[in-house]
Amino acid sequence: MAKLHDYYKDEVVKQLMSQFDYNSVMQVPRVEKITLNMGVGEAIADKKLLDNAAADLAAISGQKPFITKARKSVAGFKIRQGYPIGCKVTLRGERMWEFLERLITIAVPRIRDFRGLSAKSFDGRGNYSMGVREQIIFPEIDYDKVDRVRGLDITITTTAKSDDEGRALLAAFKFPFRK
């Protein structure tokens, strides 16, 4: 079992119950899923780029990514409906906790010129979204085998009812928010 999950059950639940005066343990917000998305717009010209992006995402997440397709045709971007233009992975359970632990302890500190994550990236319902400019911050990616530096979107979906609850949950995990 992931250390972060044990830490959540032992420490974070007690901390949040006292902070928000919950009556039941089930009211305490928890991390539901983590979604990783990599948009590869250049895949229109070269399909190999999408395969490489999917391989990178598989290495980062530990599971096979789902290829996303264009919902509608856009002439300005030269894409048609149904063209493969990206890939995404939804992590739940044990893999989610392991990824979150790696993200907080290893990947985020390796971001260049890092001054903390924005605390304003909550959506109003306690879910947090962030973008990473380089996939090479993850130790699973071999720097020498990278054909192109790509970014990815990371969305942490929680059961929190408000942004304050979601922020308190992630802050309890020692998420490096900007002061």
Swiss-Prot record:
Domain of life assignment: Bacteria
Molecular function per GO: rRNA binding; structural constituent of ribosome; tRNA binding
Self-association state and partner proteins as the record states: Part of the 50S ribosomal subunit; part of the 5S rRNA/L5/L18/L25 subcomplex. Contacts the 5S rRNA and the P site tRNA. Forms a bridge to the 30S subunit in the 70S ribosome.
GO biological process, one term: translation
Residues passing through the membrane, by range: none
Keywords tagged on the record: Ribonucleoprotein, Ribosomal protein, RNA-binding, rRNA-binding, tRNA-binding
The protein's role, per its UniProt record: This is one of the proteins that bind and probably mediate the attachment of the 5S RNA into the large ribosomal subunit, where it forms part of the central protuberance. In the 70S ribosome it contacts protein S13 of the 30S subunit (bridge B1b), connecting the 2 subunits; this bridge is implicated in subunit movement. Contacts the P site tRNA; the 5S rRNA and some of its associated proteins might help stabilize positioning of ribosome-bound tRNAs.
Protein name in UniProt: Large ribosomal subunit protein uL5
Pfam families in the record: Ribosomal_L5, Ribosomal_L5_C
Keyword check for Ribonucleoprotein: yes
Keyword Lipid biosynthesis: no
Family designation: Belongs to the universal ribosomal protein uL5 family.
Gene3D superfamilies: 3.30.1440.10
GO-annotated cellular components: ribonucleoprotein complex; ribosome
Record lineage: Bacteria, Pseudomonadati, Pseudomonadota, Gammaproteobacteria, Enterobacterales
